Amino acid sequence: MQKQHQRQHKVELVANLKTQFADAKALLICDYKGLSVRKLEALRNKACAQGIKVQVIKNTLAHIAMKETGYSDLDLKETNVFLWGDDQIALSKLVFDFQKDHKDHFVLKAGLFDKESVSVAHVEAVSKLPNKEELMGMLLSVWTAPARYFVTGLDNLRKAKEEN
């Protein structure tokens, strides 16, 4: 009876992971060996505030969920923490910022963007891109520049006429 209950729990967990992985635009797998529970909880709290999921999952269960969701095949070994979400940039920034502070205990092992495997270097490059809010600010600045220059030009013309 106990084994059947455990098996049912695992089946439900895999089904839940499949639905969450299917909706995710990015999935990162990190080694967290030696990281304290308190620090892992701090990572979870930061991630949750950004809509990013963090979970320690058995490799066999994660492999089944990923395979059935259409992710490229990964060789999962040792201890892994899985982070996934919709914003590739925010997820990459979160992982590399956390990794910077915990070099010895937290390392990115693999990354998947849009269900395709990407290198650690690619994820690091994405982490250096501006986030959505910064991009919107840049775009707004570009859009308002012509009007700003026009108004400045008119003001300079007015000042020149006042001096004459």
Swiss-Prot record:
SUPFAM superfamilies to which the protein is assigned, alphabetical: Ribosomal protein L10-like (SSF160369)
Swiss-Prot/TrEMBL keywords: Ribonucleoprotein, Ribosomal protein, RNA-binding, rRNA-binding
Span of the signal peptide: none
GO cellular component, one term: large ribosomal subunit
Matching Gene3D superfamilies: 3.30.70.1730
PROSITE patterns, per database record: RIBOSOMAL_L10 (PS01109)
MF terms in GO: large ribosomal subunit rRNA binding; structural constituent of ribosome
GO biological process, alphabetically ordered: translation
Keyword match RNA-binding: yes
InterPro entries, per the entry: Ribosomal_uL10 (IPR001790), Ribosomal_uL10-like_sf (IPR043141), Ribosomal_uL10_bac (IPR022973), Ribosomal_uL10_bac_type (IPR047865), Ribosomal_uL10_CS_bac (IPR002363)
Similarity-based family: Belongs to the universal ribosomal protein uL10 family.
Record's subunit section: Part of the ribosomal stalk of the 50S ribosomal subunit. The N-terminus interacts with L11 and the large rRNA to form the base of the stalk. The C-terminus forms an elongated spine to which L12 dimers bind in a sequential fashion forming a multimeric L10(L12)X complex.
Function per UniProt: Forms part of the ribosomal stalk, playing a central role in the interaction of the ribosome with GTP-bound translation factors.
Protein name: Large ribosomal subunit protein uL10
Organism per entry: Helicobacter pylori (strain Shi470)
